[in-house]
């Protein structure tokens, strides 16, 4: 990018005390750092189509589904920033503004913190929290990494702010030792490609109100996106006539189902063999919950512990509905899902 070192970010709006609804309205004026992964099709949280709907305020993400996770992240942000400052010795501070790229006004940045480095330069600091099991996303083959969906966020911010370094501090436990610090430096080739893809998303989809195609590899993410957009099924709607494009998709789907069916037969046989061997071991254990094998080269401990859970049978649920409808209606929720099924029609005689 020819003007990489010749610009300063513009301030779109001050965020100190800005009501959330107004903040969201300003975010819809462009693409933010946390939007970048969805534009690239690498977000584990939402699709590019979800982002498109959000920018046009058609369908927004349901924060109620993960409100605890969002609230924990917000509450812990100052603490994690303090941990970063303590570990590095860098001075950190906030700049409570939503920034805008002067050359690409649809590129926005709302930063967590800034860090003042010993050489007098400034870096961006992004705060993250995760659970213990997800900490492995910050490693690859024993090497420290930044997850690609967060990397795109950091590189977006570097482009907007014209800053050459981003630090991430991610807390996965309840002690200072369970905070990971990662650093990425500016990559102009990555940045140019990111800007081109974001420009295409903004100008050719958002501004023209043309939904982007689903390009994500995660089918569950796509189905959840469609569920939010489409809502309940309409049983009175006429059948939809599919064209050649959809026939190609259908043919591939049927082929994959056949492959899965063949593999499932092998899996089913393996499951039966595993259960047979498990039965032999359980027979030897009897009523004991533990068994031990002590060999010369290796040792094993088997546990077969009881697991109890509360539940209610379908028959009991029907009796509850009949005898105590007030209690039933208070605690039972009815959810709707749609079953996808393909049936090959018989060819009609000419």
Regions found by a protein language model. Give the residues of each.
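Short alpha-helical basic/polar micro-motif
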Residues: 82, 155, 254
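Metal-dependent nuclease catalytic cores that hydrolyze phosphodiester bonds in DNA/RNA
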Residues: 1-124, 131
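Short, hydrophobic/amphipathic alpha-helical patches that form generic packing surfaces
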Residues: 49-54, 159, 254-257
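Nucleic-acid nuclease catalytic cores
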Residues: 70, 86-111, 115-206, 344
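Short, positively charged
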Residues: 189-238, 311-350
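Contiguous, amphipathic alpha-helical segments that mediate oligomerization or scaffolding
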Residues: 208-214, 220, 227-294
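Extended, charge-rich alpha-helical segments
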Residues: 103, 251, 262-350
């Amino acid at each position: 990018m020819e003007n990489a070192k010749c610009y300063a970010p513009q301030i779109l709006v001050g965020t100190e005390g800005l009501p959330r609804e107004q903040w969201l309205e300003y975010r819809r004026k462009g693409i933010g750092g946390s939007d970048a992964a969805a534009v690239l099709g690498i977000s584990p949280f939402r699709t590019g189509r979800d982002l498109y709907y959000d920018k046009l305020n058609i369908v927004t993400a349901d924060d109620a589904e993960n409100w605890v996770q969002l609230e924990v992240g917000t509450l812990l942000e100052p603490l994690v920033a303090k941990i970063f400052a303590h570990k590095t010795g860098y001075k950190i501070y906030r700049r409570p503004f939503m920034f805008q790229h002067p050359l690409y006004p649809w590129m926005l940045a709302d930063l967590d913190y800034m860090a003042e480095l010993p050489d007098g330069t400034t870096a961006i600091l992004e705060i993250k929290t995760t659970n213990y099991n997800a900490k492995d996303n910050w490693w690859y083959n024993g090497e420290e990494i930044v997850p690609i969906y967060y990397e795109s966020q950091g590189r977006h911010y570097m482009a907007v702010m014209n800053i050459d370094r981003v630090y991430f501090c991610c807390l996965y436990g309840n002690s200072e030792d369970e905070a990971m610090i990662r650093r990425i430096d500016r990559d102009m080739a990555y940045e140019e490609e990111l800007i081109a893809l974001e420009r295409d998303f903004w100008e050719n989809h958002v501004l023209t109100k043309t939904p982007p195609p689903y390009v994500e590899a995660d089918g569950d993410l796509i189905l959840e996106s469609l569920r939010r957009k489409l809502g309940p099924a309409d049983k009175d709607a006429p059948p939809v006539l599919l064209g050649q494009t959809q026939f190609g998709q259908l043919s591939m789907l049927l082929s994959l189902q056949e492959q899965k069916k063949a593999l499932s037969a092998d899996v089913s046989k393996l499951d039966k063999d595993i259960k047979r061997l498990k039965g032999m071991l359980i027979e030897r254990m009897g009523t004991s919950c533990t068994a031990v094998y002590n060999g010369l080269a290796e040792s094993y401990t088997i546990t077969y512990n009881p697991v109890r859970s509360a539940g209610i049978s379908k028959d009991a649920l029907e009796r509850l509905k009949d005898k105590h409808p007030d209690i039933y209606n208070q605690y039972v929720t009815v959810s709707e899902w749609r079953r996808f099924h393909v049936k090959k029609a018989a060819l009609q005689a000419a």
